[in-house]
């Protein structure tokens, strides 16, 4: 065997890929080979960082492993130690050097962290500075130069600090002087709008209307104070004003006079507890100071209190059939039966309690702003009358006295006329009359609108005048038929709505007076709409050449109408062969009868008296037309079709 030549054999793995699965038929499924990144990750997972990294332990472990793995290697190792020859020891782990470097870096970081903790906390160790050698007694010229520069810089800094302190004081004084000038300028603006006077060391103003003729006893005095709630160190706010006003506590907040009309009277227990809803304060005009808005609101509160006091005084003094009721902040009057007029003083202050009460008592809007505005106009007129009645300064040699007394001499006024001039209506009486007119006008408008929406034929139109009086309004009512406005315009009514009655003026000048009852106006308009149908037939007959035989607005025959009277008209065809009779009532409606010639009436019995043929041309009895089966959009259109069917065809 020794003489046989050696053969070189290449040994390689039997399978380059690992077998994943072997099927029942012997088919093997291989795993794909790992990529370089996957192989790197697999090798990194084999590193055990928990074991020690000492070289002695590794060498000991390697020696023991080799001794256990190769029993015959002990003697050779001893021989190597004795000889002192260092042999290469392979590592047990992949990337062993990487692991060792990472562990050493971690150890250094831990040591650095501990040192920093000791330096910062100083609980366990204190670091003393390293002592330096003392400088020689002889100083360098550079050191002397540095010391001189430091002294000069310190002197310059002291000068700058003193200058900055002086500048700060001057700025503060300028701000104080500016605030003082602003206070004087604001006080000048305040004097341009309000009456001011100086009493002692205080500046007082007047909110009342005494100079305009008011007799309200409230003093209405406010005080002008200087606003000192400003920190000069902070930035001045944009809305800052150096002047402020202090008004009486009873004039704070907002107030208004609420006037409402109620159809049903509330219980007697509800009187004086009117639901208040807070009206927002008026927004200040851009550029106006805040004290202007504050004083205007306070003056408005004072005026509202004066109006309510005047109304309460008149309500107690006036003797009426239904006495007026004054309870707390509410005045209740009864202008019409089952109708109430409520006048309330609503005053809400700026405190939280009143705001909470206002939010809880918030109610729907039923306030009549027109009457509130009229109350303000009436109180100003009352002020003007009071101011004009005051005797002005006059010469002693020619006294002219009161205006009414002056007029009584030249114009020879007697006592009754002078008394009539002196007697005038009060504020409450005027506002009650205006409330009556507003309620009557709204009721008339509602009645006309309900009829216009309920009745389509004929149509009713209302044209309200935009120029009205506080005690009288006018509306023009037109009753027309759709498509026939040019020929059917005979019903034109002018309604003059007053305080307690409505005057109706017809087109021909007739005048009818209606009361405040809603039913009277409704019945009158229904009767006029009924008469319009008959007038439309009359105008249509003239256009189509038919002859009007009879016409009456008030028919005495037939069923009696509960609303007004029925009207009727009879027209004949141009040839005289046919006749149409129309009767229209407000409740019974329309009834149309047609009269045919006798020769066309087959159901007439033969008469032994009338033997001549000329009597056959006379018209026979009337036959009623089934009006609801006629085609047409309205009454006049149906009547036009009926007349066209009965008229001869002219070719």
UniProtKB/Swiss-Prot annotation:
Gene Ontology MF: a single term: transcription coactivator activity
Top-rank taxon: Eukaryota
A Gene Ontology term for the protein's cellular component: ubiquitin ligase complex
Localization of this protein: Nucleus
The keyword Cell membrane appears for this protein: no
Keyword Cell membrane on entry: no
Region (Disordered): 51-83
Tissue specificity of this protein: Ubiquitous.
Signal peptide: none
Keywords linked to the UniProt accession: Activator, Disease variant, Nucleus, Transcription, Transcription regulation
GO biological process: positive regulation of DNA-templated transcription; positive regulation of transcription by RNA polymerase II; positive regulation of transcription elongation by RNA polymerase II; positive regulation of transcription initiation by RNA polymerase II; protein ubiquitination; regulation of transcription by RNA polymerase II; RNA polymerase II preinitiation complex assembly; somatic stem cell population maintenance
Pfam family, one: Med17
Clinical disorder: Microcephaly, postnatal progressive, with seizures and brain atrophy: A disorder characterized by postnatal progressive microcephaly and severe developmental retardation associated with cerebral and cerebellar atrophy. Infants manifest swallowing difficulties leading to failure to thrive, jitteriness, poor visual fixation, truncal arching, seizures. There is no acquisition of developmental milestones and patients suffer from marked spasticity and profound retardation. Progressive microcephaly becomes evident few months after birth.
Family: Belongs to the Mediator complex subunit 17 family.
Subunit structure: Interacts with GATA1 and PPARG. Component of the Mediator complex, which is composed of MED1, MED4, MED6, MED7, MED8, MED9, MED10, MED11, MED12, MED13, MED13L, MED14, MED15, MED16, MED17, MED18, MED19, MED20, MED21, MED22, MED23, MED24, MED25, MED26, MED27, MED29, MED30, MED31, CCNC, CDK8 and CDC2L6/CDK11. The MED12, MED13, CCNC and CDK8 subunits form a distinct module termed the CDK8 module. Mediator containing the CDK8 module is less active than Mediator lacking this module in supporting transcriptional activation.
PANTHER family with a match to the protein in the record: MEDIATOR OF RNA POLYMERASE II TRANSCRIPTION SUBUNIT 17
Function: Component of the Mediator complex, a coactivator involved in the regulated transcription of nearly all RNA polymerase II-dependent genes. Mediator functions as a bridge to convey information from gene-specific regulatory proteins to the basal RNA polymerase II transcription machinery. Mediator is recruited to promoters by direct interactions with regulatory proteins and serves as a scaffold for the assembly of a functional preinitiation complex with RNA polymerase II and the general transcription factors.
The name this protein goes by in its record: Mediator of RNA polymerase II transcription subunit 17
Gene that specifies this protein: MED17
């Amino acid at each position: 065997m020794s003489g046989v030549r050696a053969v070189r054999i290449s040994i390689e793995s039997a399978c380059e890929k690992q077998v994943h699965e072997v099927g029942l038929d012997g088919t093997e499924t291989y795993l794909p080979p790992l990529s370089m990144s996957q192989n790197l990750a697999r090798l990194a997972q084999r590193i055990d960082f928990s074991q020690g990294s000492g070289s002695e332990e590794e060498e000991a472990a390697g020696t023991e492993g080799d001794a256990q793995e190769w029993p015959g290697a002990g003697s050779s190792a001893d021989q190597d130690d004795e000889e002192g020859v260092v042999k290469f020891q392979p590592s047990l782990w992949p990337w062993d050097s990487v692991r060792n470097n990472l562990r050493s870096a971690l150890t250094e970081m831990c040591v650095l962290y501990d040192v920093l903790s000791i330096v910062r906390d100083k609980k366990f160790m204190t670091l003393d500075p390293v002592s330096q050698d003392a400088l020689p007694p002889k100083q360098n010229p550079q050191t002397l130069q540095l010391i001189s520069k430091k002294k000069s810089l310190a002197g310059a800094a002291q000068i700058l600090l003193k200058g900055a302190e002086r500048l700060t004081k001057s700025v503060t004084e300028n701000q104080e002087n500016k605030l003082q000038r602003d206070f004087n300028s604001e006080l000048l603006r305040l004097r341009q709008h309000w009456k001011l006077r100086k009493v002692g060391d205080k500046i007082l103003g007047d909110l009342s209307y005494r100079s305009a003729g008011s007799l309200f006893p409230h003093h209405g005095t406010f005080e002008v104070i200087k606003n000192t709630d400003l920190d000069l160190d902070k930035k001045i706010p944009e809305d800052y004003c150096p002047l402020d006003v202090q008004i009486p506590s009873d004039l704070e907040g907002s107030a208004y006079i609420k006037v409402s009309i109620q159809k049903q009277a509330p219980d007697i227990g509800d009187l004086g507890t009117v639901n208040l809803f807070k009206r927002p304060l008026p927004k200040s005009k851009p550029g106006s100071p805040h004290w202007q808005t504050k004083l205007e609101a306070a003056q408005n509160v004072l005026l509202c209190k004066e109006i309510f006091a005047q109304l309460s005084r008149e309500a107690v003094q006036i003797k009426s059939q239904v006495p007026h009721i004054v309870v707390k902040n509410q005045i209740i009057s009864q202008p019409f039966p089952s109708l109430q007029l409520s006048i309330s003083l609503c005053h809400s202050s700026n405190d939280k309690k009143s705001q909470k009460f206002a939010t809880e008592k918030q109610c729907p809007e039923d306030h009549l702003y027109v009457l509130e505005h009229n109350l303000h106009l009436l109180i100003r007129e009352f002020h003007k009358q009071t101011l004009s009645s005051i005797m002005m300064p006059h010469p002693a040699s020619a006294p002219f006295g009161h205006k009414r007394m002056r007029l009584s001499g030249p114009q020879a006024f007697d006592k009754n006329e002078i008394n009539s001039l002196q007697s005038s209506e009060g504020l409450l009486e005027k506002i009650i009359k205006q409330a009556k007119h507003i309620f009557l006008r709204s009721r008339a408008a509602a009645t006309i609108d309900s009829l216009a929406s309920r009745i389509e034929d004929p149509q009713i139109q209302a044209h309200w005048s935009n120029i009205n009086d506080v005690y009288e309004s006018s509306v023009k009512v037109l009753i027309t038929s759709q498509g026939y406005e040019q020929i059917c315009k005979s019903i034109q009514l002018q309604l003059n709505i007053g305080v307690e009655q409505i005057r109706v003026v017809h087109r021909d000048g007739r005048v009818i007076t209606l009361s405040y009852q809603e039913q009277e106006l409704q019945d009158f308009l229904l009767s006029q709409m009924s008469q319009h149908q008959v007038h439309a037939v009359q105008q249509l007959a003239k256009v189509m050449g038919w002859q009007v035989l009879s016409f009456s607005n008030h028919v005495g025959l037939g069923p009696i109408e509960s609303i007004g009277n029925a009207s009727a008209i009879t027209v004949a065809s141009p040839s005289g062969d046919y006749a149409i009779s129309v009767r229209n009532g407000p409740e019974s409606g329309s009834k149309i009868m047609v009269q045919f010639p006798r020769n066309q009436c087959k159901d007439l019995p033969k008469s032994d008296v009338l033997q001549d043929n000329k009597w056959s041309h006379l018209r026979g009895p009337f036959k009623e037309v089934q009006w609801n089966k006629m085609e047409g959009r309205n009454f006049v259109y149906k009547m036009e079709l009926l007349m066209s069917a009965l008229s001869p065809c002219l070719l």
